[in-house]
Amino acid sequence: LMIVNVMNAFGERQHVEKFIPLCIDRILKSEKIYIHSYPDMKESGTRFYIHARNIAAAVLFLITNGNLGEKYNISGEREVSNLEMAQMIARVMGKTLDYEMVDFHSDRPGHDLRYGLDGSKLFGMGFKLPVNFEESITKTVNWTLENKKWLEY
């Protein structure tokens, strides 16, 4: 038995309520995107987003290279702010991003603005993400644009 921790997975076919498909949908409709920020409204929350393909590759790597009884964090290659993510999506779509920073924390005390895992143990074992972050976002956005019906669910 090995324990694997993962967070902020994304990819093709992700439910539209999640941040990345929600951004794609709102940008397509020229709607405003509300970005959760710190109370100063200058800095948005951050995540270590990771594509489902990279998660699957990490699990397969651990099956052959991991040690039974150990815990492993599977994380993305870098920390990305939610604003940066929305800007990347708009850029891939060739659209303008209409957004507003909101202090969501005051409405939801305890809401986490930063999700992060230290994946250095896995990377230190020689694991390499097979698909880089920018390529993963581009593929996800393009797939969603080619399958807009998916945004209706």
Q: Which residues does each predicted region cover?
A:
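Conserved beta-loop-beta element that borders a ligand/cofactor-binding pocket
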Residues: 1-12
